[in-house]
Every structure is written in C-alpha cells, then in structure tokens.
Amino acid sequence: MSWISPELIEILLTILKAVVILLVVVTCGAFMSFGERRLLGLFQNRYGPNRVGWGGSLQLVADMIKMFFKEDWIPKFSDRVIFTLAPMIAFTSLLLAFAIVPVSPGWVVADLNIGILFFLMMAGLAVYAVLFAGWSSNNKYSLLGAMRASAQTLSYEVFLGLSLMGVVAQAGSFNMTDIVNSQAHVWNVIPQFFGFITFAIAGVAVCHRHPFDQPEAEQELADGYHIEYSGMKFGLFFVGEYIGIVTISALMVTLFFGGWQGPLLPPFIWFALKTAFFMMMFILIRASLPRPRYDRVMSFGWKICLPLTLINLLVTAAVILWQAQ
C-alpha cells in the first residue's frame, strides 16, 4: 500500500515501544504494592495478604476492583477542579519521568539530549500536584502535609540534581544513553560513590518514602495531603508513588550501575534485575528504619547532603581538569 511509508512505520514502532515500556512501568508499580505487603509481613513475622487467590496472588486484582467501585467522593468545600487535577498531575509527571530511561539498546521512550534535566523538571512538576491536593481539599491536615511535602521535595531535589552533576561531568552529556555507554569499563558508582549515596537518600525523600514520609505520617497528619481522596483519585496517588520508586530505582541503575550492561544475559534482563534489587531496598528500608522528626530531616539535608554533594562535585571537576592536562 502506497500510504505506508518507512517514516510512518518508524513512528508506529516508536509509539508501540512507548506504550509497552510505560505499561510495564505501571504494572511494576502496581505489583510492587502487593510485593511490599507480603515482604513486610515476612519481615514482621506475620503472613500478609494471602486470602485472595493462591498465596494471595490475586490480592492486587481484588484491590483494583474495590478501588474502582468505591465512591469517588469530593469534599463539599473543596476546589473541585484543582482537587480533581492534582492526582492526574502526580500520576502523569511521575510516569513521564521514566520516559528518558533506556531499558536496553534502542528501547527508550524519549532519547533526549537533556534527559537528566527532563527528569528533574518532571520531579518538580509533581510538587505542584501535592500543593494542589493539600490546598484544594480545604482540610488542615491535608494542608500541613502538603506544606511539609513541598518543602521536603524542593529541598531534596536540590541535592538530587547536584548529585548527578558529577556523572554529567564525567560522561560529558545529559543524555541517558550516552551516560550508560560511558560506563562500559567502570560503573559510575565507583568514582561517584558519594554522589550515589546522596542520590539514593534524596530519591527516597523525593518519593516521600519511609523514613522520609513525614508528609503522610499517619500518627501526626492522618495520611497527609491525600486524606480527603478516595476511589480512583486516591488510586492515582497510590500507584503514582510506586511508579516514582520504580523510576528512581531505574535511574540508580542507569546513572551509577551501568544500565543494561552485563555479561551473558540479555540487556533487558540485566536492567530488570538491577532495578528489582533497588526496589527491594526501598522495601527493606521501610521495614527497618524509624521515622525521624521533620526538623531533623530538613537539617540532615541542608547540613550533610548539600556539603557532601558540593564536595563530590568539586573533587570530580578537579580530577577531570587534572586528567586533561
């Protein structure tokens, strides 16, 4: 057929790749919620969800059906438009942040030359969703949770971005594929160890995960900025949080652990195994660490993480200049 051109086929293949990758990310985020509950039960010497299906294997399906049929309630005195937009912005921004991650050679949704900057932009956009949710709910606990979340996220995004500048300086590019290719001989985690530590800490904080989950602290704020959400709106926030974990784990692999590179196994398998390891670390951290006070979280970021990232960046720049001479 004359209307089928090579350009059209290329566009269709690109769309197909994007749909497949993003569907896999959403599925991984959903299944991680079930896996986390089972593993937390194991860590805490209890069973966890094991009633629906064999060994609880259909628990996720039951939760999805329950959430889909729950009443989608909107508070009487809330700002209905902003209240509805907030979970959509949160889910979309966190999902789009994964678009620049190459899962194997040639398999990336958007191979941008400003890949890292695009990720930081999407992470910053998620802050607006939190503020919208807290403000539009017209609830004091929701507003306090949103203020905590926005201050914490904006603070730790500074350290998140600075921790990546050493990687960018070594690779000479913001493109994620170029960064993976630059690790053919040595993974960035070795020369950029302190950058990796800071990125991991800031990544946990940006995802609002334990022990940095003060914006959602049940004992203090009754679930924080999404206290008034129910049904599918709450589901978008809930799944979006786990998509954020998948994205941060994938970025750790891509930026510091060679991405898809590895012996014997296919590239995608290596990428999936490395990412699954860091997703498991998120769950282990939640099971083992206590929640510190909010002021100590902020103090830790500005007094320890910020100097560490600046020292790492200065040392990296000095080494690059010394090698160039």
Swiss-Prot record:
NCBIfam families: PRK06076.1-1, PRK06076.1-2
Cross-referenced InterPro entries: NADH_UbQ_OxRdtase_su1/FPO, NADH_UbQ_OxRdtase_su1_CS
Pfam families the record matches: NADHdh
Chemical reaction(s) catalysed: a quinone + NADH + 5 H(+)(in) = a quinol + NAD(+) + 4 H(+)(out)
GO terms, molecular function: NADH dehydrogenase activity; oxidoreductase activity, acting on NAD(P)H, quinone or similar compound as acceptor; quinone binding
Name assigned to this protein: NADH-quinone oxidoreductase subunit H
Keyword Transmembrane: yes
Encoding gene (name): nuoH
Keywords carried by this UniProt record: Cell inner membrane, Cell membrane, Membrane, NAD, Quinone, Translocase, Transmembrane, Transmembrane helix, Ubiquinone
EC number of this enzyme: 7.1.1.-
Protein's cellular compartments: Cell inner membrane
Organism lineage: Bacteria, Pseudomonadati, Pseudomonadota, Gammaproteobacteria, Enterobacterales
Chief place of localization: membrane
Topology of the protein relative to the lipid bilayer: Multi-pass membrane protein
Any single Gene Ontology cellular-component annotation: plasma membrane
Gene Ontology biological process: aerobic respiration
PROSITE patterns the record matches: COMPLEX1_ND1_1, COMPLEX1_ND1_2
Key word Membrane present: yes
